Structures are given as C-alpha cells and as structure tokens.
Design a protein with these regions (language model features):
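Single conserved hydrophobic/aromatic residue that forms the stacking wall/gate
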Residues: 2-9, 13
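Generic beta-strand/beta-sheet core signal
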Residues: 6-7, 26-28, 39-42, 107-109, ...
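Phosphate/diphosphate-binding loops
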Residues: 11-61, 185, 189-196
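Short, glycine-/Ser/Thr-/acidic-enriched flexible segments
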Residues: 20-22, 28-32, 41-44, 55, ...
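N-terminal beta1-alpha1 cap of cysteine-dependent amidohydrolase-like domains
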Residues: 50-204, 208-219, 233-241, 316, ...
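Amide-donor transfer/coupling interface in amidating biosynthetic enzymes
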Residues: 123, 143-151, 190-193, 227-367
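A short alpha->loop->secondary-structure connector
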Residues: 218-228
Length: 367
C-alpha cells in the first residue's frame, strides 16, 4: 500500500482525535464524506510504501517472526516424502428411495463449537438438521443423552461430528470423550446400521479426530483400532494454528466428493492444535492405493507438500482428509463449513467446497 504523502498512517495515529470506534474502509474510489481521510492506495506489488520508503512484505514478515522463532516457531520439522495417487473414478447411487430433504444429525458434545456453522451449511444445501446436546452433569444425564442420540442416528441419513474441543481435549489428547460415546454398544450398532443402509458420515477437525481414533476411519467400522492405526497428533509447531490452507483433491471415490476433479484446489480455513495426521509408510501406501486419501495440503504451485507453512501441522504425506474404503465416511481437518458468501474476501482461490451439496445430491439421486 502507498501511504498518502500529505497525511500518512503515522500522522493519523498520532492525532489526538483518533479514537476507538474509528472505521477503516477499503473502497474502489474516494469517499465523499467530510470526516473521511485517504490513508493510501492498494497496489499489486507485495510491498508497503510509507513516506517514500518501500518495504517488501517478505522482509517485513521475516523481521516480525525470526527474532523469537526459536521460542515461537512458525515452521515444524518437514517430513521427507509425499505420496500421490490417481484412483479410478467411481459412481455412487443411494440404495434407498430418493430423499428430497435428507436428515442430518449433529450431536453437540461438551466443547463442540462448530455445530452452528455446520448446521447452517447443511441447511443452505437443502438438508433438514437435527441436534441434541450430550449432557454429562450426572450419570443419568449421560444415559438419557445417549438414548436420545441413538434415536436421532436411527432416523438420520447423515451423521456429522462437528469441530471443537470435546471435553477440553482431556485427558491428554483430543476426541477421547467422543470416542467413548461412539463405542457405546447402542451407538455403535446404530452407526453401523446407518452405513449399512447407505447413510453418510462426516467428521471435521475434532470430528475427524474422533473418526480416526474410533476406527471409523480408515476402516469403516468401530472398534478396529490397533497400535498400527493412524492418529492425529500435536502440530509440529507445538501450538494451535489458525490460517487458510490450500488443499488438493486426491480422489473422487466418495459421494462427498461428487463432481470434484483430482488436482482441484480449495482454500480452506484450519484451526486446531492436534491436526498432524500420523501414519506408517505401509498403511499410507495402502490408503493411496485404495483411493482413500481425499485431500492433501498443497503448496503455491498446487503440489502436495510436506513443507510449512503450506502443510501447517506437519501431516505425514501431506494428508489433510481421508475416506473409508466404501466412500461413505469422510474426515478432514479443514473447516469447509466456515465459508459463506462475502467471507475471506481478501483470500485467493476457490473457497466453496461443495461437500454439503454433494451429500444432499446423493440422497436426491441427482445424476
């Protein structure tokens, strides 16, 4: 941005009349308003020019971060290898009667904080959304909540685990509370019945952690977790990260991924402390061979990458999301639900990732 010569940013901030409640406006032309002051102009060049001094953004970022990088790193350890695959496309047809308004069920656990956004995204796509709160004040509350949850799953077409920090990510790790609920026999039986009848399951962020740690991903069934199973672990930078990432479509072998093209890129919000997908090389090769890797973190050129900041948590083989082998279950770290019109307007790329519309189309049997 070029600061105006006669009245730069520094001048405005030094003036006594500057106060809280002032509004910074970005507009196409000069505002015809008596109290509006022109501060500068946007330019294509990646630099700030203030009082005639040009400062490249890259140098400013380096100066802002490198002094404390040893204590507050913005990059973790880069893994050496990245895999890719080119799975054959698949067609998915819902085995039941066409449903114009599929029912989505979102359980709200202690610590869930993305249920409103997720519900709004599904409603915008044409689904009916039902929620229930899992109350854990007393033992009877838990039992009553689980019974209610069981009935909701039985009547749902889509089961969704939204993002958040269930039970504060305690004890010592994310999603353990949700996993215990999923492994309740009544809940487990209803979830298996849901997928057996062609229903869909989605887990985002904390929900993805629960799907992986319960065995629903990548195995498609609860109770199949072993010491060789993948997991989600603390980010390499050892702290919470919040940014926009570029993710690359790696497969279309799921109703959730209907209409996507392998290699297609999306700009997606991420916000998590434990988003590093950890998997052995042997199992990773199996996931890629099966076409179960849904999305990978991508660099500026659109290629899967192990390097920060594009792969912000250090995920193995750049994996951001995976699907079950039958394609009915999808889990991912990126918050697809957080985008809507007029958000992230200063972010480049395709921010509309049509997972929710794809799920509704599957039940409507749209060809």
């Amino acid at each position: 941005r070029d600061a105006q010569e006669s009245r730069g940013l520094g001048d405005v901030y030094k003036r006594q009349e500057y106060a809280y409640g002032s509004i910074l406006v970005e507009c196409e032309g000069t505002l015809e308003y008596p109290h509006a002051e022109l501060l500068g102009f946007t330019v294509a060049e990646e630099a700030l020019t203030v009082n005639g001094v040009k400062m490249p953004l890259e140098e400013l970022y380096k100066a802002n971060t490198e002094k404390f990088a040893a204590v507050y790193p913005d990059k973790g350890r880069n893994s050496a290898e990245v895999m890719t695959s080119a799975p054959a496309p698949k067609t998915f047809v819902y085995p039941g009667e066409a449903v114009e308004t599929p029912v989505v069920y979102i359980p709200v656990f202690p610590g869930t904080n993305c249920d409103y956004d997720t519900a709004k995204a599904f409603r915008a796509a044409g689904a009916e959304v039902r929620t229930s709160v899992l109350c854990n004040i007393a033992g009877d509350d838990v039992l009553r909540s689980i019974a209610e949850m069981k009935e909701h799953i039985r009547r749902a077409h889509i089961f969704v685990l939204a993002g958040g920090f269930s039970a504060g990510d305690e004890p010592d790790g994310s999603a353990k509370f949700i996993v215990n609920v999923l492994n309740n026999k009544d809940i487990r039986d209803e979830i298996h019945a849901l997928t057996d009848r062609g229903g869909l399951i989605l887990g985002i962020c904390n929900g993805f952690q629960a799907l992986v740690k319960s065995g629903l991903l990548p195995y498609g069934r609860l109770g199949m977790v072993t010491k060789e199973s993948p997991t989600l672990f603390r980010n390499d930078v050892n702290r919470h990260i919040s940014q926009i990432v570029s993710t690359r479509v790696a497969t279309t072998a799921s109703p959730w991924l209907r209409g996507f093209r392998p290699g297609e890129l999306h700009s997606i919000a991420v916000s998590h402390g434990e988003g590093k997908f950890v998997v052995s090389e042997e199992l990773a090769r199996e996931l890629f061979a099966n076409g179960q890797v849904a999305f990978q973190y991508a660099d500026a050129a659109g290629n899967p990458t192990a390097e920060a900041p594009w792969n912000p948590n250090g995920s193995s083989y750049a994996i951001e999301g995976i699907i079950s082998q039958n394609g009915l279950i999808l889990g991912k770290m990126g918050h697809t639900e957080r985008y809507e019109n007029n958000l992230f307007k200063n972010i480049a790329g395709n921010k509309q990732q049509s997972l929710f519309a794809n799920a509704v189309a599957y039940f409507r049997k749209v060809q």
